[in-house]
């Protein structure tokens, strides 16, 4: 009897072991599937020099070396301080036309950044290009510039509190579109500068203001214009001073007493950041950046979509220090304007902008005094972007190589990045055009993932394959190669795919860089995307309709189904 019981328990134990091993294989194969690849249209770009090119032949030799080693595009700061320096609406694009011509001769694509910030004074800056001097006569310094907690005034970029921002950017974007329409075939993407160093943030960590790493930096909303905006926002939220006092536990007697934090580090060490007042301030502080992104995004879509028909992107800074400081958690991120990444990235989606994130090469080291967690931060931001269907492009924060390229490979494959841009050209190409020692590692870990021949599945080089998760039983796709001619409404019926519940279609887009499309049921019932069309890049994508009329999402690659998982092994054990 005892022997029989022992055999039973032994069999139960082995069954449990088999189950655990099976689960391990299952989850392991799921992880490898989810982390296996970049997006189907992944390409590699390299950032050009900050300062003006003076030797065009040498520059062309550098570009040719990039082309010969698998790089897709050169990314370039198009400095506002150069092109409109002579006066309001007095543009000179001649330098950048020469630049674009040189890039074209080398066989590369060109990705311009409309750089509405100053070059000089930040990490990696080797030039001095201020904003156009005439600009400051358009309004007061209090409206147009930043002021921090200590009173330092910063004019790296225009303050989002100035009402003239939209008009100035609209004029700049319109002139660029007019002057570079003839170059549209070589421009696969356009980036917008959202603030200092081209990033959507406040100038919270600026060495000239006294900042040094790893200090938290300073809040930047101490002009009278900014403080007035905060008061207005709080009055709008609560309705009256009495209700503000009730929410904050204060005894303010005048609206003028409503103010951004005035206690420096004490805002954190005293816990102010974690009470209702602190949360209201930090949420509003970020919302100013969100509104700014909406303004510049709308101006960009208005001017660029009809001419270029390409994706437009903007960048969030990888503020990775002070993240896990027990007394001042996330304080550096907060000073830069990042309080709620989920909400911030949703604004990218709502504005139909791609997201560039930086510091992909860095490793965590979360100990004092830096409390630096860049790898964790990349994971956080990338995961949120993936969940919302926001396209991702990566960058390195500092010069890198070797293990840094390995880290980049880990991130771009784990989160299905659509592109990576290396900072900067002199990291992998010498001035004489010869490759540096880092070129080999860059090719082995990053460039090798580029998709020069479409999606790798035998489709034409410039084709788009779309899997449509059926919201409509018989979906139609109304489309055009971006900038081309639309199909007749309702478009083309999408046939069923090899995957149950999905339709599928492959479309050749010729020389266009994207497919512009909308979906319907063939009977004038249209998929809602806030009255905007969807854009698909070459390669394979999966489209998932939204619910209750909300916008759908686009994910890189084909759908992941149960058949993608390795079958669980059957374990037969003798006992």
Curated annotation (Swiss-Prot):
Cofactor: Ca(2+)
Organism: Niallia circulans
Disulfide bonds: 119-127
Cofactor note as given: Binds 1 Ca(2+) ion per subunit.
Transmembrane segments: none
Residues at which Ca(2+) binds: 84, 88, 171
InterPro entries listed in its UniProt record: CBM25, Glyco_hydro_14, Glyco_hydro_14_CS, Glyco_hydro_14A_bac, Glycoside_hydrolase_SF, Ig-like_fold
Keyword Phosphoprotein found: no
Residues the record lists as binding substrate: 77, 117, 125, 315, 320, 358, 396-397, 424
Subunit structure: Monomer.
Record's catalysed reaction(s): Hydrolysis of (1->4)-alpha-D-glucosidic linkages in polysaccharides so as to remove successive maltose units from the non-reducing ends of the chains
Enzyme class: hydrolase
Protein name per its UniProtKB record: Beta-amylase
Stored Gene3D superfamilies: Glycosidases, Immunoglobulins
Entry's EC annotation: 3.2.1.2
Domain of life per record: Bacteria
Stretch forming the signal peptide: 1-36
GO molecular function, one term: beta-amylase activity
Active site (catalytic residues): 199, 395
Keywords recorded for this protein, A-Z: Carbohydrate metabolism, Disulfide bond, Glycosidase, Hydrolase, Metal-binding, Polysaccharide degradation, Signal
One example of a Gene Ontology biological process annotation: polysaccharide catabolic process
Family: Belongs to the glycosyl hydrolase 14 family.
């Amino acid at each position: 009897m005892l022997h029989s019981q022992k055999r039973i328990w032994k069999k139960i134990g082995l069954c449990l072991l088999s189950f655990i091993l099976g689960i391990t294989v299952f989850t392991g194969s799921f992880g490898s599937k989810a982390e296996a690849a970049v997006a189907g249209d992944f390409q590699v770009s390299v950032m050009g020099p900050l300062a003006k090119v003076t030797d065009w032949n040498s520059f062309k030799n550098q570009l040719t070396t990039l082309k010969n080693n698998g790089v897709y595009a050169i990314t370039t700061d198009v400095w506002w301080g150069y092109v409109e320096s002579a006066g309001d609406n007095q543009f000179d694009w001649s330098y950048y036309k020469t630049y674009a011509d040189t890039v074209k001769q080398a066989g590369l694509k060109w990705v311009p950044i409309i750089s509405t910030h100053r070059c000089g004074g930040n990490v990696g800056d080797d030039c001095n290009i201020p904003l156009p001097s005439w600009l400051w006569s358009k309004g007061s310094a209090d409206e147009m510039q930043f002021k921090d907690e200590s009173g330092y005034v910063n004019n790296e970029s225009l303050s989002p509190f100035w009402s003239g921002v939209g008009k100035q950017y609209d004029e700049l974007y319109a002139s660029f579109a007019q002057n570079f329409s003839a170059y549209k075939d070589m421009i696969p993407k356009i980036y917008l500068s959202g603030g200092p160093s081209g990033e959507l943030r406040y100038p919270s960590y600026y060495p000239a203001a006294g900042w040094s790493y790893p200090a938290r930096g300073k809040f930047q909303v101490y002009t009278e214009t900014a403080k007035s905006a905060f008061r207005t926002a709080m009055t709008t939220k609560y309705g009256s001073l009495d209700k503000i006092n009730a929410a904050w536990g204060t005894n303010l007697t005048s609206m003028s007493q409503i103010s951004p934090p005035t206690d420096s580090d004490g805002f954190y060490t005293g816990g102010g950041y974690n009470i209702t007042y602190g949360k209201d301030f930090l949420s509003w502080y970020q919302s100013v950046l969100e509104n700014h992104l909406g303004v510049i995004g709308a101006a960009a879509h208005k001017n660029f979509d009809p001419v270029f028909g390409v994706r437009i992107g903007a960048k969030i800074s990888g503020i990775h220090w002070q993240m896990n400081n027990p007394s001042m958690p996330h304080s550096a991120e907060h000073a830069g304007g990042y309080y709620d990444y989920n909400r911030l990235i949703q604004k990218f989606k709502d504005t139909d902008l791609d997201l560039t994130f930086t510091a992909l090469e860095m490793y965590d080291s979360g100990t004092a005094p830096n409390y630096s967690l860049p790898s964790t931060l990349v994971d956080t931001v990338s995961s949120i972007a993936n969940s919302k269907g926001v396209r991702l492009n990566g960058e390195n924060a500092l010069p890198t190589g070797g293990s840094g390229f390995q880290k980049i490979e880990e991130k771009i494959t784990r989160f299905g990045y659509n592109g990576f841009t290396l900072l900067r050209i002199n990291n992998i190409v010498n001035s004489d055009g010869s490759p540096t020692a880092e070129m080999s590692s860059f090719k082995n870990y990053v460039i090798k993932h580029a998709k020069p021949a479409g999606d790798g599945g035998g489709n034409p080089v410039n084709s788009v394959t779309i899997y449509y998760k059926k919201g409509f039983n018989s979906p139609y796709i109304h489309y055009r190669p971006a900038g081309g001619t639309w199909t007749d409404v309702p478009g083309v019926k999408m046939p069923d795919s090899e995957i149950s519940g999905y339709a599928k279609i492959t479309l050749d887009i010729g020389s266009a860089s994207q497919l512009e499309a909308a979906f319907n049921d063939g009977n004038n019932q249209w998929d809602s995307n806030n009255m905007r069309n969807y854009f698909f890049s070459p390669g394979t994508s999966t489209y998932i309709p939204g619910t209750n009329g909300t916008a759908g999402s686009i994910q890189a690659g084909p759908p992941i189904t149960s058949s993608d998982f390795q079958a669980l092994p059957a374990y037969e054990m003798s006992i």
